[in-house]
Regions:
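Bacterial N-terminal signal peptides that target proteins for export
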Residues: 1-11
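N-terminal signal peptide c-region/cleavage motif recognized by signal peptidases
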Residues: 16-21
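Short, non-transmembrane alpha-helical segments in secretory-pathway proteins
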Residues: 24-51
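Short Pro/Gly-enriched beta-strand edge/turn motifs at strand-loop
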Residues: 39-40, 81-88, 129-131
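Structured segments of extracytoplasmic/periplasmic soluble domains
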Residues: 40-44, 74-75, 107-110
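Mature extracytoplasmic domains of secretory-pathway proteins
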Residues: 53, 57-98, 105-106
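Short beta-strand edge/turn micro-motifs at domain boundaries
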Residues: 97-130
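Catalytic core of pol beta-like nucleotidyltransferases
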Residues: 134-135
Length: 136
C-alpha cells in the first residue's frame, strides 16, 4: 500500500512522475515546504499551527513546484485527533483520513500554497496538475 501511495498512484495520476526529472530537495527546502503546508493545513482546520505536525511521506520537487503527501500528527508525533475541528464527527465515522496532500509553488525564496487536501478519503489531487498548470 505504501508503494502505491508513494510512487504508483502519483505517477498514474500525472502528478510529479519519476520520469519528469524531479529535483533533489535540500533540507532547507524540505523544511520550508513542510512549514508552509503545515500552516495551510492548520488554517484549513481552523487550528493554531502549534497543534499540528506534518510527517512527510512523499516530497517531490520539479523546478518551482513541489508536491507533498504527509501524515497529520500531534507535535508529540501521535496520531492527529480531529477533536475541536469541524471534521470531528466525520473523523469519528471514519470519513476523514490522517493524510494531507499539498501542491506548492516557489515564489522567490518562499514556498506558497497552491492547493491542499486535508483528510481526503479519495484522490483529491488528481486534477491539480491540469487545474494549476503544474508539471505532470
Amino acid at each position: 500500500m505504501k508503494l502505491l501511495m508513494n510512487w504508483a498512484l502519483p505517477i498514474a495520476l500525472g502528478v510529479m512522475p519519476v520520469a519528469a526529472a524531479a529535483a533533489a530537495v535540500t533540507p532547507a527546502e524540505r523544511a520550508a515546504i513542510v512549514a508552509s503546508a503545515t500552516q495551510a493545513a492548520a488554517r484549513e482546520l481552523k487550528l493554531d499551527a502549534a497543534r499540528l505536525r506534518l510527517m512527510p511521506e512523499q516530497l517531490k520537487r520539479q523546478s518551482d513546484w513541489a508536491f507533498l503527501t504527509a501524515k497529520l500528527q500531534t507535535p508529540a508525533g501521535q496520531r492527529f485527533d480531529y477533536a475541536g475541528t469541524d471534521r470531528h464527527e466525520a473523523a469519528q465515522a471514519g470519513a476523514v483520513s490522517d493524510l494531507c496532500a499539498a501542491l506548492l509553488r516557489r515564489e522567490g525564496a518562499a514556498w506558497k500554497l497552491v492547493d491542499i487536501a486535508v483528510g481526503p478519503t479519495d484522490v483529491a489531487w488528481e486534477a491539480w496538475a491540469t487545474t494549476h498548470k503544474a508539471p505532470a
